Amino acid sequence: MGLSADLFVQKRSAASSLKQPKELGFYSKTQEGQFLVNDSSKLSYYYLPDTELERNLDLCSGIKKFKECFGNPDVDACTLSGLLKTIQAYEERKNKKVPADIITFRGIMRKLISAAFDSPKYNRVDLRVLSFNGQLFIREPNQAHPPPANTSSMEYRSYYSGYKFETLSTISKPLPQVTRNSLEKRHKRICCNGDQYITVVRSGVGHCKLVLGAEVDCVFDFTEDSSDNLKHYAELKCTKGVSTFAEARAFERKMFKTWLQCFLVGINRVIYGFRDENFILRSVEEYSTQEVPLLLKNNNPQLTNACMDAVRWYGALTEWLLSSIPREESAEHIRAYRLTFENNHLKLVEIEKSDTEYDQLVNGEGILTSEFREWRKSLNKSL
């Protein structure tokens, strides 16, 4: 019988110290699924003058031409390939293994933290963990998550409007490099969710060091010729305008989740577009990530301590993973685990050799690419 462990979501860590996130690399992902390491070609720049709001921008225009790149079961949307390539490039440059205990995507860590605040019904956690070379690599299995089927439904229009807001509020190059013609025609640009720019960030909580990959929506102002542009990135969100008490409470819950998303990788700015019931963009508000905890504390008694509570749970769950899973430095010794959220606890179960997933996870490319495995073996020999 393999290893098995549970962590109840009421658990909190006494230690809540956070390490300042630092960017160690980035990559661009194309619609075709290519990963371009240390390439910023898919990075967007924020541009939405206040005068644009007078044009009654329709967040549903072009909906029938939307290039939907998610939901295809033949495309592994959860792959760690781009993240591993970027880490390998960093290690080749430094000639040492990246100092990390856990390597994954921000979205996965957000899911795990959200387990303390949501039920499994609304926050499904079904992850695979690989212990390799002294580190834990975590990913979701490749499962198609198709968008809402009815393209005329309110659900689909809400889904699309978020991508449309990103398209309307960003340009593909810094403003001085964009032609007037491109600026004037950008409202007609076809929306696509296949191109992505991913930052790779080193951070930590308590004694746990993490490397997290996270999609970046845009640069707010400018980029520097430095190795770390985190302070220039911004998160874009779009939601229905707030006009009632119930809507205010719903928006505050959204803000908490947005804060969680941004604080994990050190993104300091959130820009919210507010639309009306006809999906016309009515206003835009900018928030500092640092001000969100105080905003929630002053406005919603239920969320008074939510941000600090999230940090303490973050510390508890990472401590639990590191103490529960053996991590051998050898690049030859590999173990796989299934991590799920059931009722009121996270459940970790070792995947046995008899399991149908075992061979693909441990010996195949279910989590690690063969290129990355070979790189780590050669790095170990050279050190």
From Swiss-Prot:
- Binding-site positions, substrate: 215, 237, 261
Q: Which reaction does it catalyse?
A: a 5'-end NAD(+)-phospho-ribonucleoside in mRNA + H2O = a 5'-end phospho-ribonucleoside in mRNA + NAD(+) + H(+); a 5'-end (N(7)-methyl 5'-triphosphoguanosine)-ribonucleoside-ribonucleotide in mRNA + H2O = a (N(7)-methyl 5'-triphosphoguanosine)-nucleoside + a 5'-end phospho-ribonucleoside in mRNA + H(+); a 5'-end triphospho-ribonucleoside in mRNA + H2O = a 5'-end phospho-ribonucleoside in mRNA + diphosphate + H(+)
State any GO BP term from the record: mRNA processing
According to the UniProt entry, what is the EC number of this protein? 3.6.1.-
Q: Which InterPro entries match?
A: RAI1, RAI1-like_fam
Localization: Nucleus
Q: Which cofactor does it need?
A: a divalent metal cation
Q: Name one GO cellular component term.
A: cytosol
Q: What class of enzyme is it?
A: hydrolase
User: Mind telling me which Pfam families this protein's record contains?
Assistant: RAI1
In the UniProt record, does the keyword Secreted occur?
no
Sites where the protein binds a divalent metal cation: 166, 217, 235-236
State the similarity comment.
Belongs to the DXO/Dom3Z family.
What's the subunit arrangement here?
Answer: Interacts with RAT1; the interaction is direct, stabilizes RAT1 protein structure and stimulates its exoribonuclease activity. The interaction also stimulates RAI1 pyrophosphohydrolase activity, probably by recruiting it to mRNA substrates.
Q: What protein is this chain from?
A: Decapping nuclease RAI1
